[in-house]
Swiss-Prot record:
Stated name of the protein: Nodulation protein E
Record organism: Rhizobium meliloti (Ensifer meliloti)
Taxon lineage: Bacteria, Pseudomonadati, Pseudomonadota, Alphaproteobacteria, Hyphomicrobiales
Coiled coil: none
Gene that produces this protein: nodE
Main localization of the protein described in the UniProt heading: membrane
EC number(s) from the headed UniProt entry: 2.3.1.-
Listed Gene3D superfamilies: 3.40.47.10
Length: 401
């Protein structure tokens, strides 16, 4: 069944703001949410920068549900409700079986795990009763489903830094295959906890100050927390109810490097971008804006630049590219969901968000990465790259309708 899939609502929160309007506003104005991590439960870990959500918005999550939720699930539910409000949609007995959710989670509930096991290890006592269900990778999808009453296809997706794009791709498949008419899809993660930060510190991957994608002298990744969700519908379902269509999910490209657990390879990202263009029926020249994976590490940014050149040829120098991780940091499982918001808003507003914190050109990353200043241009097609550790790659193309 060849069904077009469109986006009719979006929700999100991260260090930049607690709704899509504020996320887009500050990202487009190159404001960076990166700063010292103020979490009081870092157990002596010093000098860590990240992009924290300083205060959650009012969410009205039922107390009985809240006690079984990790922060990842809370963020996902808040974003899902915002997306539903924007879409003007509700779930009821008439549509619940045709309404599902896929939520990408890159790391899982380490916040709940650490809070439960630290006292247990020191005292030998029992852990908190909901620890297991808070920490499971599918928890966010389950909690979104229960909060909204969704009874169609519901599952979690985990592929590290590409989890949200894989979740959106999976949701597209559910609609195209006829298993659902509407899907909530995106990602959520909350990695600013001691055990995760220590693990990334051990990999020597963390930047000491900020995230500078594609800039000479960049020093690594900065982690952030957040969630992004979108309401996906079949085109027929959306038009039948008179919904406002924000963009079409025009293509999906998935691949694996089969190379190394941490080191990047060019062929995997190249294959995913080519597959995405083919799936969307697009030529390379049709892409106006590419939201890069752009983590701010020397190897990854150089690798992605090479892959982009291979796929787009001369057009690689004509299209606009940026990494919004420079503003909201790397939110792991939520990263490409937040970048989906950037792509759709670029199409809606005709503005390419900048790569913030850019200092000086790197000759190995010589494409137009929209340094520091947003750019007005017509964006008919935007592409979003997500390339994860372990070599799991997921690329999406969004198109103006």
């Amino acid at each position: 069944m060849d069904r077009r899939v469109v986006i009719t609502g979006m929700g999100g929160l991260c260090g930049l703001g607690t709704d899509t309007t504020s996320i887009w506003k500050w990202s487009a104005r190159r404001r960076s949410a990166i700063g010292p991590v103020l979490n009081t439960e870092l157990h002596g870990l010093k000098g860590i920068v990240g992009a924290e959500i300083k205060a959650l918005p009012d969410h009205n999550i039922d107390r009985k549900q809240l006690v079984s939720m990790d922060r990842i699930s809370v963020l996902a539910v808040i974003a899902a409700h915002e997306a539903m409000r924007q879409a003007g949609l509700s779930c009821n007995e008439g549509n619940a079986l045709r309404f599902g959710a896929t939520v990408g989670v890159g790391l899982g509930g380490w916040d709940a795990t650490e809070k439960a096991y630290r006292p247990s290890l020191s005292t030998g006592g029992r852990t908190e009763i909901f620890t297991g269900v808070k920490a499971m990778p599918s928890a966010a999808a389950c909690q979104v489903s229960m909060s909204l009453g969704l009874r169609g296809p519901v599952f979690g997706v985990t592929s590290a830094c590409s989890s949200a794009n894989h979740a959106i791709a999976s949701a597209v498949d559910q609609i195209k295959c006829g298993r659902a008419d509407v899907m909530l899809a995106g990602g959520s993660d909350a990695p600013l906890v001691w055990i995760v930060l220590k693990a990334w510190e051990a990999m020597r991957a963390l930047a000491p100050d900020t995230c500078r994608p594609f800039s000479a002298g960049r020093k690594g990744v900065v982690l952030g927390e957040g969630a992004g969700m979108a309401v996906l519908e079949s085109y027929e379902h959306a038009t039948a109810r008179g919904a406002t269509i924000l963009a079409e999910v025009a293509g999906v490209g998935l691949s694996a490097d089969a190379f190394h657990i941490t080191a990047p390879a060019v062929h995997g990202p190249e294959s995913a971008m080519r597959a995405c263009l083919a799936d969307a029926g697009l030529n390379a020249e049709d892409v106006d804006y590419l939201n890069a994976h752009g983590t701010g590490t020397k190897a990854n940014d150089q690798n992605e630049t090479t892959a982009i050149k291979r796929v787009f040829g001369d057009h690689a120098y004509s299209m606009s590219i940026s990494s919004t991780k420079s503003t909201h940091a790397h939110c792991i499982g939520a990263a490409s969901a937040l970048e989906m918001i950037a792509c759709v808003m670029a199409i809606q507003e005709g503005v390419v968000p900048p790569t913030a914190n850019y200092r000086e050109p790197d000759p190995d990353c010589d494409l137009d990465v929209t340094p520091n200043v947003p750019r007005e241009r017509k964006v008919r097609v935007a592409m979003s790259n997500a390339f994860a550790m372990g070599g799991t790659n997921a690329v999406l193309a969004f198109k103006q309708v």
